[in-house]
Amino acid sequence: MSLTKQAKPLNEKQQRFVLSHIGDTRDAIRNRVMFLLSIDAGLRAKEIASVEWRMVLDAEGNLTDAIRLENKSAKGSSGGVVYMSERLKSALADLLAVSKPISTIVKTKSGKPFSAASMTNWFWLLYRDLGFEGCSSHSGRRTAITKWARTISQHNGSMRDVQALARHSSLQMTQRYVEVSEDAMKRVVG
């Protein structure tokens, strides 16, 4: 991703709007999972396209609290444990109830796995149709990382924890993802 033109993160109002819009789509359950894998788990388009049911289910077929993202599904060798929000886990449970838990979690309308390119295109079309200029498949990841950075200190964490959540090899890369908040700067100064 170019450092001069980053994908815009989504604010809370935009996130609610997307979730409402997705609820009215043909594949609402699947689409909700794809969106939440982006904004809650911070997955890249390639990772969303390739995450498999076996990465989120235990031996008995129950959902776990984390995605065990394999290196082959991640950028570079950045696989690892990706923790799930309650709303993502709930959305996955809804999808599991209407899906066969084999191979990839999200599939195209024809039942085939998404490619990284088709997943990227799905997000681009979603944001274009909603009029969200500057948003792309990476907007959800930037949204997640910015949220983590703003709230990690409330949980006795640090930016190194955010770096680990983002699965970045350097703290500098993680810092580039974090959106500046003028409101937060004003409040901290008093």
Language-model segments: residues:
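DNA breakage-rejoining catalytic core of tyrosine-based enzymes
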Residues: 1-16, 76-85, 101
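Basic, Lys/Arg- and aromatic-enriched nucleic-acid-binding interface segment
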Residues: 2, 12-41
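N-terminal core-binding DNA-recognition domain of tyrosine site-specific recombinases/integrases
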Residues: 26-29, 79, 112-118, 133-139
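Alpha-helix N-cap/helix-start motif at helix boundaries, enriched for small hydrophobics
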Residues: 34, 46-51, 162
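C-terminal catalytic core of tyrosine-transesterase DNA break-rejoin enzymes
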Residues: 36, 40, 143-168, 176, ...
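Conserved tyrosine-mediated DNA breakage-rejoining catalytic core shared by Y-recombinases
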Residues: 50-88
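Catalytic-site neighborhood detector that most strongly recognizes the C-terminal catalytic loop/helix
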Residues: 69, 73, 166-190
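C-terminal catalytic core of Y-nucleophile DNA break-rejoin enzymes
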Residues: 73-93, 103-125
